[in-house]
Amino acid sequence: MNKDNQIKNESGKQAKILVSEIVNNLKNELGINIEIEEGYSIGYPNQEKQFKMDFLVQFTDFDNEQWLIKSTNSIRERIYGTEFFAQNIRLIDEKVKNIYVVVPDSISSAEMKKKRNYSVKINGTTYTSFLTDVLTVNELRQKIVEKASQNIAQGLRANVLGNDAETSIVNLLNDLKNKALWNDYQNAQQTIKSSTYKIYKEILEKIDLKEGFDKILEVTATNDIPLLSNRGKPKTDVSVTIKTNTKELIRNISIKNTREKTVTIHEGSVSDLISRLKLSETDPLSQALIHFEKVGSKKKLIAEHPNSDKILEENLKLYNRELIEFLHSPLLNDKIQMVDLIIFTNKFAVWNRDDYIKHYIEEYSGKGQFGTPFKWTYPSKKRGQKIQIKGFSNN
C-alpha cells in the first residue's frame, strides 16, 4: 500500500473512531438513554446482509427509534453507494427513522463546502435522497442530545443541556487534538479528526489569535467559577488560560444555551437597579421605577401612573449600556466573574463583550420596552415585590 493510501485509510479510521467516542461518551458520561451498535448490516430475507452502516443509535425512550450513521472524510467518495444502501435499508428495516452521513468538524473548508452543498441538495425539492442529512460530528451530537432529552421536564432539561454546553466548551478548549490542528492544520488534519475544531478556531480567532502563527503551548479551561458575593451563580461559565509562543491570555466566557427568543436575565428588587444606576431615591426616574415595580406591567403603569411611563420612555434608554453591564456583571467579587466572551450554542456565535454590548443595543432597543433592549415584567406571584427583566437571545 502506497503512502497516500495509508494516510487515506488512517484518516477514515480516525473519523470512525471520533464518532464512536462521541456517541459512547453521550451514553456513558452524559447518561443519555441510548443503545449503540457498531457495524450495522442488514439484507433481504434469505440473502446476505449486504447493506451496511457504521453505527446504529437506538433511543430506548422513544419506542426504540433507530438512527444510522455513515462516517466519512469526503462527501464525494462513496456517497452514491451510501445512498444505494440507505434506499434498501429503508425498504427492509421499518425501525430506522433517520440515516446520516457524518463528517469530522475538522475537514478542510473545501470539503465543508461540499458537505453544505449536499445537505442543501438532500433537503431541497428537486433531488431524491434516502439520507436524512449530512452532518458534522458535533451537529450529530447536538441532535442526539436534543432527541434524547425531549421527554425530560423543561426545568431539568434546561439544566442538563446548560451543564452539557459548559462541559463541552471546557473539553473542546482542553482537547489536544484541537491544539495540534491549530498549530499545523495542513499536516495534522490528514490523520487527526475533531468534532469541535471549527468552534475552537472561532473562539481563538475572536481573541485575536491566528491559526498556525500563534503557536499554542498550553490551554487550561475550567467551569469551576467562584460564586457571587450573594452566593448566586456568576455570568462567567468557563474561564480559559491560553499560553502561546509569545503571550499568555485569560478569557472568561458566558455560554448562552437556549432555543427561546427571550430569557429571564434578572429578578430582584428595583432598589438594586436604582443603586447600580447611581440614582437618588428622589430622582423622578427612581420613582418611576418604583411605580413600575408596584404595578408590574407597562399597561398598568400607563393606567395608574401615566407620568411615570413617560419618564421611563424618555429616560431609561439613556442608561442602556449601564443596564446591560448591571444585568451581565452583578455583585462581582473576583475578576474571573467578569465576562470577556459570549458564546451562543443553539445558533452558534462568538462575541467579545464590547462588540456584543454595541450589537445588542443596536439590534434590540426597538424590540424591547421603554426604549431599552429588554422586556420588563414581574416574577410569577411576585407582583409589587420584585421586577423581572427578560433579554433577547440570537434565535
Swiss-Prot record:
Q: What class of enzyme is it?
A: hydrolase
Q: Which residues form a coiled coil?
A: none
Q: Name one Pfam family in it.
A: Endonuc-MspI
* Complex and partners: Homodimer.
Keyword Hydrolase assigned: yes
Q: Write down the EC number.
A: 3.1.21.4
What processes does the entry annotate via GO biological process terms? DNA restriction-modification system
State what protein this is by name: Type II restriction enzyme BsuFI
Q: Which cofactor does it need?
A: Mg(2+)
Q: Which domain of life is it from?
A: Bacteria
- Please write the reaction equations for the catalytic activity of this protein: Endonucleolytic cleavage of DNA to give specific double-stranded fragments with terminal 5'-phosphates
* Gene Ontology molecular function terms on file: DNA binding; type II site-specific deoxyribonuclease activity
Asked if Transport is a keyword of the record, the answer is: no
